[in-house]
Amino acid sequence: PTDIVADIGAGTGYFVFRISPLVPQGQVLAVDIQQEMLDIIESRAAGTADNVSTVLGTVTDINVPDASVDLILLVDAYHEFSHPREMGRSMFRALKPGGRVALVEYRAEDPSVAIKPLHKMSQEQAIREMEALGLRWAATSDRLPQQHLMFFTRPAD
């Protein structure tokens, strides 16, 4: 209930407003590179979600303070990054030691997933890229019918 959660690529806040009640003493950071999306979230949050804040990121930086976030949520966003290494480093810095990343991407391994290949990621690729940032793969859930739900952690050392 006290976690700081950053939704990277928050869009209009679909997940932001579902997470907000789960962290009543925490905070949800809605991060996006489009001010228009953040304006929508701010309008929706006014008077109803006091623990929601918006953050204007860039294509290379999520603009969140170092070691401030317990959980980063990336839903169908990572593959869109034009500068994945820089964004990855920025996310790693923002995570507290022991912090987690929940990464959701369409399954590249499954040809029945009717999404263009450029919008998919294999589990192997995701693990390789997250581990290159210093994150450790913790688990993959098969709860979603077409997407990987992968969990990574920042080492506590």
Q: What function would you assign to each model-found segment?
A:
Residues D70-R85:
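A short SAM/SAH-binding and catalytic strip from SAM-dependent methyltransferases
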Residues I4-I62:
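Class I SAM-dependent methyltransferase SAM/SAH-binding core
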Residues I62-L71:
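A short acidic, Gly/Pro-enriched loop at the edge of an enzyme's catalytic core
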Residues R100-I127:
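Conserved class I S-adenosyl-L-methionine
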Residues W137-A139, R143-D157:
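Core SAM-dependent methyltransferase catalytic element
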Residues R85-R100:
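A short glycine-rich, Lys/Arg-flanked "PGG" loop and its adjoining helix->strand segment in the class I
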Residues V23-P24, F81-S82, L95-P97:
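Helix-to-beta-strand junctions that scaffold the AdoMet/dcAdoMet cofactor pocket
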